[in-house]
Amino acid sequence: TCNTPERQAEAAMNTRISKCSDFGSGCSCDGNIICHASVYDDFVKALVKEGAYIANADEAEKLKLVMWDETGHRLPDTVAIAPQKLAEKAGFEIPADRKFIAVTGGGRENIGKEHLFSSEKLTTLMALFKYDGEFENALDMVRAIYEVGGKGHSCGIYSFDDDHIHRLAMMAPVSRIMVRQPNNKGNAGSATNGMPPTSSMGCGTWGGNIVSENIALKHYMNTTWVARPIPEDMPSLQELFGDFYKDGMDVE
């Protein structure tokens, strides 16, 4: 539903705000964008207006060499640096007014552990992916990205379609989804989205954590449970299992 210039401009602004915070070093900063083919070109133009530099294929290969080693491990000296510095390390120059770099990632075929631009960047660079057809194709790309990394943390969606938002929420292995807002600002908690303010985000069992909430004061407080005898209130197995109940399950 990012199908008007105004909505594309807002989505691009949200992307720029999230990508550029702390030079893109935060886990909540945008790393991969999945955009429908029908609005892709116009959205890229909106990103450029917001300060994106679109790297060509040769520049993208140079960036890859200074961001990851030959085994795919992220190189620390290009983490959290300005886009001009990142380009300089890669061997090319970008204008001084550019706020971040974007590489064109392609489609579903370019997502996977062997495709490094689909992994976490931790700097002022993002990858732009394009999908055609039904929204399910975008969800398939989301699944693939989280197989590369980032399960449990977060994602965002710029949409006014409640069905699309619901379908993403039902399948994405994340603890928080930001709708039409900068991911890094929204994840950390805001008076305009109801998320508890925090700098620590639980990622649930997806991320090896015990909670999937924003870590807040309640998580640092010890709770003492006082249990007194009460009348037994034991549901039947049929009530517990519902449609999965089979006759004889409660026979010892």
Task: Show the residue positions of the predicted features.
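Conserved C-terminal structural/oligomerization subdomain of aldehyde/semialdehyde dehydrogenase
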Residues: F92-E252
